[in-house]
């Protein structure tokens, strides 16, 4: 199954990166069969290291982006709204910035654009980007509550659209029973 998500990066990326972007067609493409997501690390705004394993039990929407990437910038408000819509269901949008300047670059970016629901997560050395096999930005990987990659999308998307939110909910699986009661 694939959901339309807007224009691809193909025109903006050279060589193999363009081929990879065209390969997803700007659509959320399910990973069939699902594969165990690789271990990857990133840091928070204070420089503390985290990994995907820290979020086991939560659904993850891992977005690899940068402030210098126009399609990335364009989709950030939708990712912020998606995080607001999904937070109570135990789904975390991890927007991992690859900006080398880290917090000094991303914090004012968030403030200037009114990004309020996304955490400030950093991947300035590209460790998560390499581990997830991203060949262009933005790349987004949906990981279920058990740590399995369920889908990915290369290019920007309207993450807050009802059909995209429904797809994310279906792919990550239902929240634990105790979350349903709150």
Q: What do the PLM-derived regions correspond to, one by one?
A:
Residues 174-182:
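Non-globular targeting/processing and membrane-anchoring segments
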Residues 59-60, 91, 138, 148:
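Alpha/beta-hydrolase fold active-site loops
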Residues 74-113, 124-130:
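Structural microenvironment flanking redox-active thiols in thiol-disulfide oxidoreductases
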Residues 52-70:
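Short active-site neighborhood of thiol/selenol oxidoreductases, capturing the structured segment around
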Residues 111-116, 123-170:
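Thiol/disulfide oxidoreductase modules built on the thioredoxin-like
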Residues 21-52:
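N-terminal "domain-start" segment that seeds a small globular fold
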Residues 60-62, 94-96, 141:
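Conserved hydrophobic packing residues within short motifs/helices of P-loop NTPase cores
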Residues 1-20:
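N-terminal export signals
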């Amino acid at each position: 199954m694939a959901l339309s998500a807007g224009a691809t990066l193909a025109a903006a990326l050279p060589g193999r990166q363009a081929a990879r972007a065209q390969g997803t067609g700007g659509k959320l493409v399910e990973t069939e069969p699902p594969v165990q997501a690789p271990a990857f690390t990133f840091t928070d705004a204070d420089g503390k290291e985290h990994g995907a394993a820290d979020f086991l039990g939560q659904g993850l929407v891992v977005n690899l982006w940068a402030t210098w990437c126009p399609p990335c910038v364009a989709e950030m408000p939708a990712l912020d709204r998606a995080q607001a819509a999904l937070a109570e269901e135990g789904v975390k949008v991890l927007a991992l910035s690859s900006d080398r300047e880290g917090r000094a670059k991303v914090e004012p970016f968030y403030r200037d654009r009114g990004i309020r629901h996304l955490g400030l997560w950093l991947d300035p050395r590209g460790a998560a980007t390499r581990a997830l096999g991203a060949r262009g930005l933005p790349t987004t990987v949906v990981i279920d509550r058990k740590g399995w990659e369920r889908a990915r999308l290369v290019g920007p998307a309207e993450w807050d659209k009802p059909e995209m939110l429904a797809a994310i909910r279906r792919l990550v699986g239902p929240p634990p029973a105790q979350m349903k009661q709150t």
